[in-house]
Amino acid sequence: MRVVIQRVSHASVTIDGHCKSAIQKGMMILVGIEETDSREDIDWLCKKIVNLRIFDDENGVMNKSILEDEGNILVISQFTLHASTKKGNRPSYIKAAKPEISIPLYEQFCKDLSCALGKEVKTGEFGADMKVELLNDGPVTICIDTKNKE
């Protein structure tokens, strides 16, 4: 699984002209799922996300997790995170999982992340054409890949 985490002042997702979900201060997370992802990837990633210290403490130092900061999370499915640009100029998405694999994993990820956060995680709609708006705070943007844990 690959995620791009952005610390935001606010974020929203619109589908067919209607706001599906919106959050105030917190994280907007793009998540891409590949064929080899599993429950273990979800477990590791959820723990990592809720404990990631990217929010400012009283001294302005990034030292607080989203749990401590009481922030919100908006999760958007994003198969293009698995784009390969190795050959030519047109990205290949061969590593992105097919819907029959990615939808259940995406739903489980959102459910488990809600449990880890202790409140509802807002989402987009899997496979929909979405318009995502956000105000990146910092900016702070973190990329995590469960197959390359750095």
UniProtKB/Swiss-Prot annotation:
UniProt entry keywords in alphabetical sequence: Cytoplasm, Hydrolase, RNA-binding, tRNA-binding
Catalytic activity as recorded in UniProt: glycyl-tRNA(Ala) + H2O = tRNA(Ala) + glycine + H(+); a D-aminoacyl-tRNA + H2O = a tRNA + a D-alpha-amino acid + H(+)
Cross-referenced CDD domains: Dtyr_deacylase
GO MF: D-tyrosyl-tRNA(Tyr) deacylase activity; Gly-tRNA(Ala) deacylase activity; Ser(Gly)-tRNA(Ala) hydrolase activity; tRNA binding
A GO CC term assigned to this protein in UniProt: cytoplasm
First-level EC class: hydrolase
Short sequence motif Gly-cisPro motif, important for rejection of L-amino acids: positions: 138-139
EC assignment: 3.1.1.96
GO biological process, one term: D-amino acid catabolic process
Protein's cellular compartments: Cytoplasm
Cross-referenced HAMAP family: Deacylase_Dtd
Family stated for the protein in its record: Belongs to the DTD family.
PANTHER family xrefs: D-AMINOACYL-TRNA DEACYLASE 1, D-TYROSYL-TRNA TYR DEACYLASE
Record note on domains: A Gly-cisPro motif from one monomer fits into the active site of the other monomer to allow specific chiral rejection of L-amino acids.
Physiological role: An aminoacyl-tRNA editing enzyme that deacylates mischarged D-aminoacyl-tRNAs. Also deacylates mischarged glycyl-tRNA(Ala), protecting cells against glycine mischarging by AlaRS. Acts via tRNA-based rather than protein-based catalysis; rejects L-amino acids rather than detecting D-amino acids in the active site. By recycling D-aminoacyl-tRNA to D-amino acids and free tRNA molecules, this enzyme counteracts the toxicity associated with the formation of D-aminoacyl-tRNA entities in vivo and helps enforce protein L-homochirality.
Subunit note: Homodimer.
Protein name in UniProt: D-aminoacyl-tRNA deacylase
Species whose genome carries this gene: Bacteroides fragilis (strain YCH46)
